[in-house]
Regions:
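Short, charged/polar connector segments at secondary-structure boundaries
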Residues: 1, 6-7, 11-85, 96-102
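Residue-level marker for well-ordered alpha-helical positions
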Residues: 35, 66, 130-131, 157-158
Length: 271
């Protein structure tokens, strides 16, 4: 049978009918903690039932318990205890995020996408952004401002987001870089590949400023990251070199005006 009662934990369902939450933001890793959980499952079984919601046709979506389901698989269990709850999508998202935020050692990327999913769910349910950010932060000991910082990380390309997870890039640096377009973020990653360096917070702010001023180039990123200033070009012309091209009655102001006009015309033709 697919279903039977389980030691007061709820119903027991075959593992094959339990599916991961759609776009589940939390990783399930085969690490030391998972190995310990597998041993516990082998010795005592699953002590806390998985929370699931019905999808129809005897299939269920896991709200809480993805690590337990994976441990059961590694331990060779074909059935796991579940508690079934009917939930709409937004309620399910909120429950999924809240249950997983209790995990230890959550990566910035996991928290980022979890916060964004919960924020969107709460907004769908009519909660304003400011209130929802405060509520989300309260449950995870983060301020509303910090919640927004984490959500900004979801706009990073994978290479940069992974660098934040590895603590190679600081959280606030990631936030600054998240305002760049994908091609601009790719420039940052290409500079990292060639120099071995990511921008500091101060450098990231300057990169963002260039982006807002529409002056950002890969060379500017490189110069900022390696700490070099772009050299200014200085041209000095002697007075007699210039005056030979002008009538004797032209004073300094007239000469300056003509030179500027000629340079403007040249620039328009060559850029």
């Amino acid at each position: 049978r697919d279903v039977e009662r389980s030691r007061g934990l709820g119903d027991v369902y075959k593992r094959q009918h339990l599916h991961s939450f759609e776009n589940h933001p939390f990783q399930v890793n085969d690490d030391e903690a998972m190995a310990e959980l597998v041993e516990s499952v082998k010795e005592e079984g699953i002590l806390t039932a998985l929370l699931v919601r019905p999808l129809g046709d005897g299939e269920y979506e896991i709200i809480a318990g993805h690590r337990r389901r994976h441990a059961a698989q590694l331990a060779g269990l074909k059935e796991v205890p579940v508690i079934i709850r009917n939930m709409d999508q937004d309620t399910a998202v909120r429950a999924m995020v809240d249950s997983n935020l209790q995990r230890p050692n959550i990566l910035p990327s996991e928290k980022a996408f979890a916060y964004r999913m919960k924020m969107e769910a709460m907004n769908h349910q009519g909660t304003s952004g400011g209130i929802s950010a405060k509520d989300i932060g309260k449950n995870a000991n983060d301020s509303a401002r910090q919640v927004y910082r984490y959500i900004r990380l979801t706009y990073l390309m994978n290479d940069l987001l992974n660098a934040v997870d590895r603590d190679v890039i600081g959280l606030q640096v990631g936030v600054e870089l998240s305002y760049l377009t994908v091609p601009e973020q790719e420039m940052v990653e290409e500079v990292h590949e060639s120099t071995g360096k990511y921008p500091s917070l101060e450098q990231a702010k300057k990169i963002r400023q260039h982006r807002e001023e529409k002056t950002l180039t890969k060379e500017i990123v490189r110069l900022l990251v390696i700490g070099e200033r772009k050299k200014k070009t200085t041209v000095t012309l002697k007075q007699d070199e210039i005056k030979k091209y002008f009538p004797p009655e032209y004073d300094e102001q007239k000469i300056r005006t003509v030179i500027c006009q000629l340079l403007e015309e040249w620039s328009n033709q060559n850029h």
